[in-house]
Amino acid sequence: MLDPNLLRNELDAVAEKLARRKFKLDVATLRQHEERRKVLQVETENLQAERNARSKAIGAAKSRGEDIEPLRREVNQLGERLSSAKTELDALQSEIRDYAFSLPNIPDDDVPDGRDENDNQEVSRWGEPRQYDFPIRDHVELGEIAGGLDFAAAVKLTGARFVVMRGQIARLHRALTQFMLDLHTEQHGYVEHYLPYLVNHASLYGTGQLPKFVEDLFHTQPLNEEADTSAYALIPTAEVPLTNLIRDEIIEEDALPLKMTAHTPCFRSEAGSYGRDTRGLIRMHQFDKVEMVQVVKPAQSMQALEEMTSHAEKVLQLLQLPYRKVLLCNGDMAFASCKTYDLEVWLPAQNTYREISSCSNISDFQARRMQARYRSRTDKKPQLVHTLNGSGLAVGRTLVAVLENHQLADGRIAIPAVLQPYMKGLTHIG
């Protein structure tokens, strides 16, 4: 959520910055609402003060034995006018608040302008795509050779965009998860968390999935503020429960930065992606991910973004997977982000790089929604923290990359050295 003071006092500047994201701010309506809000605010304050004064006058008149009925009628009339003004003010503030919740974050000045992924800027590359002297198989065929990827069984159990893994493929999937968690907790300083996979309405508002992206969620009942406690949604990412741990909290400065990680399944309806990536594991309704979240002081958030991105890169480097680092343009960034790096891994069967991690600085956008603050040593007034999140990594897509990049001519898969301890010493599968 954007700073309300910016919307009140620097509306044209905000509109100009959001225009870089191809978002048209309704300046005229907002300005009109703000003018009316100010009038109503003054009116309610004046009516309240006048009503209080008349109420006191009733007591004084009563003690003097005077007729207080005219004053009572006046107090009642003031109360009716006050109630009407408050009702209008509350409705207007609610409308302004709802509109503010629909506004994306302001992009950082370093973010390039652009419309979509074609305008993103490549920052660097690591590793050289391997040259093969045999026909390249994709991960679906390799999984079938190993007997470990069964999409037909998943269709029978549930439907499209699900998978059943078994045997060595299931073990490799688990090994990747354990390797990522161990790397982030033992070398990168994150604290592992186990989290609920169902979250409530407030959590989804806190991280920005609601109200804009309700169609992307799987939910148990329609999500609204009045719903009972059974109105939950399956998490689209561990970012939601991890980040909401600091909702309505004041953190002491000495406790920052907070670095948290978790492995969870993620559930997404993939609304709007019909017909895209229908083969294999690339785009699933249910997939596993190891998530990284950092909570930092505002001055440290850009440095933290570089650090977090390097943590995701380290996973790819140790797995010997070629990738490129891309700075997203403002037209391709997520709703809550002010700056994002994507890591795209090389997939030989597609002869292209595909996203495997997205690392974002959210600045104070989520913190303001969640009222997540810290108290500095010098200034006792709590200030908003900055939050960051990143994939470290998407496990299913990492499995795809390992299968395709480390395939052999006979269809077997060479296990990267860092995974062999998690595979009971196996050097190959298939």
From Swiss-Prot:
Pathway per the UniProt entry = Aminoacyl-tRNA biosynthesis; selenocysteinyl-tRNA(Sec) biosynthesis; L-seryl-tRNA(Sec) from L-serine and tRNA(Sec): step 1/1
**Catalysed reactions, semicolon-separated:** tRNA(Ser) + L-serine + ATP = L-seryl-tRNA(Ser) + AMP + diphosphate + H(+); tRNA(Sec) + L-serine + ATP = L-seryl-tRNA(Sec) + AMP + diphosphate + H(+)
Location in or out of the cell:
Cytoplasm
Q: Name one GO cellular component term.
A: cytoplasm
Under Enzyme Commission nomenclature, its number is 6.1.1.11
Question: What Pfam families has UniProt attached to this entry?
Answer: Seryl_tRNA_N (PF02403), tRNA-synt_2b (PF00587)
What is one Gene Ontology biological process annotated in the Swiss-Prot or TrEMBL record? selenocysteine biosynthetic process
UniProt-recorded Gene Ontology molecular function terms: ATP binding; serine-tRNA ligase activity
What job does the chain carry out? Answer: Catalyzes the attachment of serine to tRNA(Ser). Is also able to aminoacylate tRNA(Sec) with serine, to form the misacylated tRNA L-seryl-tRNA(Sec), which will be further converted into selenocysteinyl-tRNA(Sec).
Quaternary structure note: Homodimer. The tRNA molecule binds across the dimer.
The family annotation for this protein states: Belongs to the class-II aminoacyl-tRNA synthetase family. Type-1 seryl-tRNA synthetase subfamily.
- Identification of the protein by name: Serine--tRNA ligase
Look up and give the organism this protein is from: Sodalis glossinidius (strain morsitans)
Upper taxonomic classification of the species? Answer: Bacteria, Pseudomonadati, Pseudomonadota, Gammaproteobacteria, Enterobacterales
